[in-house]
């Protein structure tokens, strides 16, 4: 039987999953995206060259690796085509290696208009979405009015479904938000063009995954966003619209729990968050700004500055428990170089009581005050180090503390953006 590893974010996203997925894809059969859409921004740096992927799995830069987009992903036709063409312009062969589930929902133009109208109307109460139609597309999926890749094969039924969806969404756009509605014919014509384009890539992703496992191939499941943004387990309502946990990998790709052999949780050596929502360890001072500057903490998809703070073990332990994380990968250790002291949040003060568990609602999180342990920093550079023994003693002590406090072993440490800037303590496929 083959081996399968799930790679997912153990914080609020932006943990560096793309680099780690690329690192682990050297000798595997396939990489599969199972949730989210082009709101993801997975940055890969190989020999100093930067590539940012939004929809296509990070294994695409490895020759011969099959890249799959599962039924749990919402697909923007325009974004997908743009990303494919940009990669093909670099000389990569894409379409023969990219397989897309017919059950994947499409992000339509009216989803984007609705997303942006909502955020504008919400003002200071906005969730902080990317404005790319992700949430409304998932709403249509659950509301059973979504248009899926499979629908493109049937022009008459597509027209019928599109008219029904437009009747609903144009009413909301024009009557509730007071913005322009969408034109049926233009969108329909665009969908017919996309139907022809995507047809050769359409394939039974779940079936491919089952066959690969029987053939003894290695498969990597690539998560987007992070556990604390999960629609069920995150800081609701300041969450994304999909399941970012290991449960999302099962339902979003079409595999069973017995098909997963290892869950790798990715976490930065500190913490970041984009958009609104509670963030107990946030540093709204020069220390936080310093981390942002050194870590280049700006969104790969939106360019928005990320909020920065100390490592939050309470939140990390929750991610470990929810996902059954087998091992952790700690990224961006080098960003902490040169800091006099470091802090790790080990508990919260909540309503005059100390708790090592996170509240289950956003308001509760907002009312938490972090309890910190302080650690000495280090002046030596860790950038590009590939051996545990060569890390400064204080850096090793910090990582050992993270491991002990989280109750989960650290298998990988990333010391820079390049594929080679990595300390491999345990290979998830070993």
From Swiss-Prot:
So what EC number does this one have?
6.3.4.4
> What cofactor does this chain's UniProt record say it requires?
Mg(2+)
Q: Which reaction does it catalyse?
A: IMP + L-aspartate + GTP = N(6)-(1,2-dicarboxyethyl)-AMP + GDP + phosphate + 2 H(+)
Which locations, inside or outside the cell, does it occupy?
Answer: Cytoplasm
Q: Which UniProt keywords apply?
A: Cytoplasm, GTP-binding, Ligase, Magnesium, Metal-binding, Nucleotide-binding, Purine biosynthesis
User: Which residues does GTP bind?
Assistant: 13-19, 41-43, 306, 332-334, 414-416
PROSITE patterns listed in its UniProt record: ADENYLOSUCCIN_SYN_1 (PS01266), ADENYLOSUCCIN_SYN_2 (PS00513)
Q: In the record's cofactor note, how is the cofactor described as bound? A: Binds 1 Mg(2+) ion per subunit.
Pathway per its UniProt entry is: Purine metabolism; AMP biosynthesis via de novo pathway; AMP from IMP: step 1/2
Q: Where does substrate bind?
A: 300-306
InterPro entries reported for this sequence: Adenylosuccin_syn_GTP-bd, Adenylosuccin_syn_Lys_AS, Adenylosuccinate_synth_dom1, Adenylosuccinate_synth_dom2, Adenylosuccinate_synth_dom3, Adenylosuccinate_synthetase, P-loop_NTPase
Binding, IMP: 14-17, 39-42, 130, 144, 225, 240, 304
A GO biological process this protein is involved in?
'de novo' AMP biosynthetic process
Give, as one word, the top-level EC class. ligase
* Binding-site residues for Mg(2+), renumbered to this chain: 14, 41
Q: Name one GO molecular function term.
A: magnesium ion binding
Cellular component GO terms, alphabetical:
cytoplasm
Would you say which domain of life the source belongs to? Bacteria
Q: Residues in the active site? A: 14, 42
What is this protein's function per UniProt? Plays an important role in the de novo pathway of purine nucleotide biosynthesis. Catalyzes the first committed step in the biosynthesis of AMP from IMP.
Q: How does it assemble?
A: Homodimer.
Q: Which family does it belong to?
A: Belongs to the adenylosuccinate synthetase family.
Put simply, this protein is called: Adenylosuccinate synthetase
From the broadest rank down, the organism's phylogenetic lineage runs: Bacteria, Pseudomonadati, Pseudomonadota, Gammaproteobacteria, Lysobacterales
Q: Which gene encodes it?
A: purA
């Amino acid at each position: 039987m083959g081996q399968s590893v799930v790679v997912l974010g153990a914080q609020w996203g932006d943990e560096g999953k793309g680099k780690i997925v690329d690192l682990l894809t050297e000798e595997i059969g396939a990489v599969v995206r199972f949730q989210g859409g082009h709101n993801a921004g997975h940055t890969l740096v190989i020999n100093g060259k930067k590539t940012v992927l939004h929809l296509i799995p990070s294994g695409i830069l490895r020759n011969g690796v099959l890249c799959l987009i599962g039924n749990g992903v919402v697909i923007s036709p325009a974004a997908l085509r743009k990303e494919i063409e940009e990669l093909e312009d670099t000389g990569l062969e894409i379409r023969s290696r990219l397989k897309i589930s017919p059950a994947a929902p499409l992000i339509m133009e009216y989803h984007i208009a609705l997303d942006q109208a909502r955020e504008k109307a919400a003002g200071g109460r906005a969730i902080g979405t990317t404005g790319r139609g992700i949430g409304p597309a998932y709403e249509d999926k659950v509301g059973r009015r979504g248009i899926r890749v499979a629908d493109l094969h049937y022009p008459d039924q597509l027209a019928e479904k599109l008219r029904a969806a437009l009747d609903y969404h144009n009413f909301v756009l024009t009557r509730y938000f007071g913005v322009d509605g969408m034109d049926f014919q233009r969108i329909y014509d665009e969908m017919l063009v996309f139907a022809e384009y995507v047809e050769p890539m359409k394939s039974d992703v779940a079936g491919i995954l089952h066959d690969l496992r029987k053939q003894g191939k290695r498969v990597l499941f690539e998560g987007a966003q992070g556990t604390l943004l999960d629609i069920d387990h995150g800081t609701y309502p300041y969450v994304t619209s999909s399941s970012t946990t290991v449960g999302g990998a099962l339902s979003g790709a079409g595999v069973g729990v017995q098909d997963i052999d290892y869950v790798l949780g990715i976490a930065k050596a500190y913490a970041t968050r984009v958009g609104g929502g509670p963030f107990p360890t946030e540093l709204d001072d020069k220390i936080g700004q310093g981390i942002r500057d050194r870590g280049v903490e700006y969104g790969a998809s939106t360019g928005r500055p990320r909020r920065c703070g100390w490592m939050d073990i309470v939140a990390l332990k929750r991610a470990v428990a929810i996902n059954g994380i087998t091992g952790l990968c700690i990224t961006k250790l080098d960003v902490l170089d040169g800091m006099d002291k470091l802090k790790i949040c080990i508990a919260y003060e909540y309503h005059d009581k100390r708790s090592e568990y996170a509240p289950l609602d956003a308001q509760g999180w907002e009312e938490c005050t972090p309890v910190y342990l302080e650690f000495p920093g280090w002046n030596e550079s860790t950038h590009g180090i590939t051996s545990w023994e060569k890390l400064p003693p204080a850096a090793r002590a910090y990582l050992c503390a993270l491991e002990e406090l989280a109750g989960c072993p650290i298998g990988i440490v990333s010391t820079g953006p390049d594929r080679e800037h990595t300390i491999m303590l345990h290979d998830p496929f070993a």
